[in-house]
Design a protein with these regions (language model features):
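Active-site neighborhood of glycoside hydrolase catalytic domains
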Residues: 149-225
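Aromatic, loop-rich ligand-recognition surfaces of beta-strand-rich domains
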Residues: 685-691, 699-836
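Aromatic- and acidic-residue-enriched segments that line the glycan-binding/catalytic groove
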Residues: 89-97, 108, 118-144, 194-198, ...
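N-terminal carbohydrate-binding accessory modules
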Residues: 22-74, 104, 600
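Short beta-strand-plus-loop segments that form exposed binding edges in beta-rich domains
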Residues: 487-493, 650-656, 723-730
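Aromatic-lined substrate-binding rim segments of carbohydrate-active enzymes
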Residues: 60-126, 198-206
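Aromatic-lined ligand-binding clefts that engage carbohydrates, nucleic acids, or primary amines
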Residues: 427-456, 485, 595-618, 625-626, ...
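Catalytic-core region of carbohydrate-active enzymes that cleave or remodel glycosidic bonds
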Residues: 204, 237-331, 335-338, 342, ...
């Protein structure tokens, strides 16, 4: 009888389990007439964008629950290729990278999942999520039908599918939609490539899996595939009807969705912390929900770009800070902000049930008293001698120095060294320069460093060449024969947006020295100007990771340095560097200290007295620091701390003012410590356009959207001056969101080499509204003058070299009515710079 009862119970349990699984698999999600359909009924997607690599795994569920308490019914996630395949062919979906577990946690908490598997994701993430090792193939064509690129993409997507295909809705999981590529219209026009990505995803997830592609209202038609759902991306304050107008004309019966509604914005080093108003965000979402428009709020919770994962923007080079707070409703450390509560109040209107309460934070916020990092190991202790021993021939090169990628290094630093000849008698094509002339003929070092180069001669600091500032030259002192030129290059995050994502690190090409130097290859003579190219380099890797830092301290214990000098072993010789404040080895290196805790909690370690580099706590890579700001603290999750002793290591490539650190309860995300101005107008500089003849003048139309103007005839020049004379809003300030110049065929000219030569006025007090916003590839950011500064206003663009142009395109702000849009204008073009 007992056996019979046991058998019956087992049978009932099996039937119950089977029924539960069957119930899950009966859910359906589809694209219907003007709406999405969940189980055959109209469904508005209310998604929260969150990124699992930016949240410590122990906090995943808390962040999901915070999104749920806002009234969201889904989470939207990118899949970061370079997190999962950091070395070619070596995949990791465990621990912090267990994206399948993240999806299961979402389902556990009643949330659906939208997956955006790239291969490119942007996200202000290193190389837009593409792995650096792709660049070991120098001629690779990224985000195109390059055979090697597509081969690796398909392998990666298949590996992701092994994790996530079992979790689609039809298989009882939470995944309802999958995105094809990402904002491809801002990169180019290539439907065959986008189609191949679509076909790859369909082969993995099935023909019935709803697929969509996202872009901007201005470019979505470039690559729109007929069999995919089209969604729009735009930010707070945008004119929502305008954003969907063209989509409605082309597909009147399609559901509308804003797949990225930008709640805030990202920060870059050397600029103020970005914020966006809560009212604009809430009103925009309210308007969309009232019209049945689905959305994903990017970001609902931003988190942190731990380690070296923060990317960089382009044109130019604008590296992102470690914090990805994004001014989102849920802040970097998982706390509800005023935006959160305002949004929650509005979202309650669209729920027939009371929204769940916000969950309790998993950790308290704690302070840490000041402590000093007393241990020091010089930078050369981090040299990768093992790699040098195995690949010495590669690292001792004839010709150009090696990039990081050429020596199989993704992140870190490289020390480049070469011997210098003597300034002396040089004869070339009738030009004779004597030692007595050395003060008249200063030497200039010319190089392209990606990204932060410090230059030394025999270990003595000469100066810095910073890619962020667009610097490529440095004056050198008089040189003696046999001295050694050393260039220490730190690579920051690779560019994540636009055509510049093919962002090699290190020295790019061959540095040259212009001046009176002999003994190198003579590459050109122009009157008394002689240019030489070094042809022998030593390239020393300094990888960026915790293990290297630990080895540096182990080496220090075995071979302690003194305060008098440091012996630096080299291949074939030993160099001795004096321990001086300007020396290569003084201050630059690894620092270690400890602090004790009686209670564990989240905290923000303050590094405002430090220089530039990376930080590790208990072996976890926290991220980058840089004294210029605006970020001065790093978020330390309490789950990475322990009661008792905790270790802090700082790799500082510049050197600290003070070796102290402390933990505070709130972050410092908006403290700039800049040496120079943040605007593009020098003190006392006034533009003089008298006598200049405009190539075009007229009036722009009022309202939103791109406008195109053609010149009467093609014009050629390097410098473009945009002069704004009045505003449609009858106020005394002007705004421009984006600006393109057109070539002779009417196509947009590349803006990669553009810089701002002058701007009469820039609003940097209420936000980062500098003039370079007019060519930053972002339609939601803009240049603005300050209130009360009278017309006319002017911006001068330096395109780098002469270009022949047939016209231009202008985009006003995206908000309804295009606030402060320019009315009357004049345009000037010159090959030479304008007068001041």
């Amino acid at each position: 009888m007992k056996k019979l009862l046991k058998a019956l119970l087992v049978g009932i349990l099996v039937m119950t389990t089977s029924s539960a699984v069957a119930a899950k698999t009966t859910e359906t999600f589809a694209v219907g007439n003007k709406t999405f359909l969940l189980n055959g009924k109209p469904f508005v997607v209310k998604a929260a964008e969150v990124h699992y690599p930016r949240i410590p795994r122990p906090y995943w569920e808390h962040r999901i629950q915070m999104c749920k308490s806002l009234g969201m019914n889904a989470v939207c996630i990118y899949i970061f290729w370079n997190i999962h395949e950091q070395r070619e062919g070596q995949f990791d979906f465990t621990g912090q990278n267990d994206v399948a577990e993240f999806c299961r946690l979402a389902q556990k908490n009643g949330m659906y999942v939208i997956v955006r598997p790239g291969p490119y994701v942007c996200a202000e993430w290193e190389m837009g999520g593409l792995p650096w090792w792709l660049l070991k193939k120098k001629d690779i064509r990224l985000r195109e039908q390059d055979p090697y690129f597509m081969e690796r993409v398909k392998i990666f997507e298949q590996k992701v599918g092994e994790q996530l295909a079992p979790l689609t809705l039809k298989n009882g999981g939470p995944i309802i939609m999958i995105q094809v590529e990402n904002e491809y219209g801002s990169y180019g026009e290539n439907k065959p490539y986008v189609s191949e990505i679509r076909d790859c995803l369909r082969s993995i997830y099935g023909q019935d899996m709803p697929l969509f592609q996202c872009d901007w209202a201005s470019n979505f038609e470039k690559n729109g595939l007929d069999d995919l759902t089209w969604t729009m991306n735009f930010g707070t304050g945008a004119n929502i009807d305008s954003q969907f107008r063209r989509l409605g004309e082309l597909r009147p019966n399609a559901p509308k969705m804003c797949s990225e509604f930008w709640s805030g914005w990202f920060d870059k080093w050397g600029a103020r912390h970005e914020t966006r108003g809560a009212e604009d965000m809430v009103n925009g979402l309210d308007e969309m929900l009232s019209k049945g428009i689905s959305f994903s709020l990017y970001m609902t919770h931003g988190g942190t770009s731990f380690g070296h994962w923060a990317g960089a923007n382009s044109p130019g080079f604008a590296p992102d800070v470690t914090s990805y707070d994004y001014d989102a409703p849920i802040n970097e450390y998982g706390q509800a902000t005023p935006k959160f509560w305002k949004l929650r109040e509005m979202m309650q209107k669209y729920s027939d049930k009371k929204l769940p309460a916000a969950p309790k934070a998993p950790m308290p916020i704690i302070e840490v008293p000041k402590f000093e990092l007393t241990e020091f190991a010089p930078l050369y202790n981090g040299f990768d001698w093992d790699y040098y021993g195995k690949h010495g021939d590669l690292l001792r090169t004839s010709g150009a120095p090696k990039t990081f990628e050429e020596v199989d290094m993704g992140w870190g630093m490289m020390l480049y060294s070469t011997r210098l000849p003597e300034i002396g008698d040089v004869k070339a094509e009738g030009v004779t320069l004597h030692p007595a002339d050395k003060d008249k003929w200063a030497c200039t070092l010319n190089l392209d460093a990606h990204d932060f180069a410090q230059v030394f001669i025999d270990g003595k600091y000469i100066g810095t060449i910073d890619r962020v500032k667009g610097e490529k030259t440095l004056k050198l002192p008089a040189i003696k024969q046999g001295q050694e030129l050393q260039i220490l290059v730190e690579g920051m995050g690779r560019i994540n947006f636009g055509r510049a994502i093919k962002d090699f690190k290190g020295l790019i090409g061959s540095p040259t020295i212009t001046g009176t130097i002999g003994g190198w290859h003579l590459s050109g003579v122009d009157e008394a100007k002689i240019t030489f190219t070094p042809n022998r380099w030593e390239n020393m890797r300094i990888p960026d990771d915790y293990e290297v830092a630990v080895k540096a301290f182990e080496m220090q214990k075995k071979n302690p340095t003194t305060q008098e000098s440091i012996s630096v072993p080299r291949i074939g010789r030993t160099m001795r560097y004096a321990w001086e404040s300007e020396d290569l080895m003084f201050g630059r290196g690894y620092y270690r200290g400890y602090f004790d805790l009686k209670k564990v909690g989240d905290t923000f370690l303050n590094f405002e007295t430090w220089g530039k580099g990376q930080v590790y706590v208990n072996g976890h890579a926290l991220g980058r620091i840089w004294s210029i700001g605006p970020q001065q603290t790093l978020y330390v999750p309490g789950c990475w701390l322990q009661k008792g002793k905790n270790e802090v290591i700082v790799l500082d490539v510049v050197g600290p003012k003070e070796k102290i650190v402390w933990g505070q309860k709130e972050p410092e995300l908006n403290k700039l410590q800049l040496a120079g101005p943040v605007t593009h107008r020098l003190k006392g500089q006034n533009l003089d356009l008298k006598g200049e003849k405009p190539v075009k003048e007229g009036q722009f139309k009022p309202g939103n959207g791109w406008q195109e103007v053609r010149f009467d005839r093609p014009v050629t020049g390097r410098y473009v001056c945009i002069e704004a004379l009045s505003s449609h809003w009858n106020r005394e300030y002007a705004c421009i969101a984006e600006w393109y110049m057109l070539d002779e065929t009417g196509q947009r000219l590349s803006r990669e080499s553009w810089t701002v030569a002058y701007a009469d006025d820039e609003d940097v007090s209420s936000g980062n509204k500098n003039a370079d916003k007019i060519f930053d590839l972002q339609e939601s950011t803009y240049w603005s003058t300050n209130r009360g500064v009278k017309f006319p206003h002017a911006v001068i663009i330096d395109m780098g070299q002469d270009k022949t142009m047939s016209g231009f395109q202008y985009l006003p702000r995206a908000e309804e009515g295009a606030p402060e849009s320019i009315k009357d204008y004049r345009m000037y073009v010159k090959s030479d710079s304008f007068k001041f």
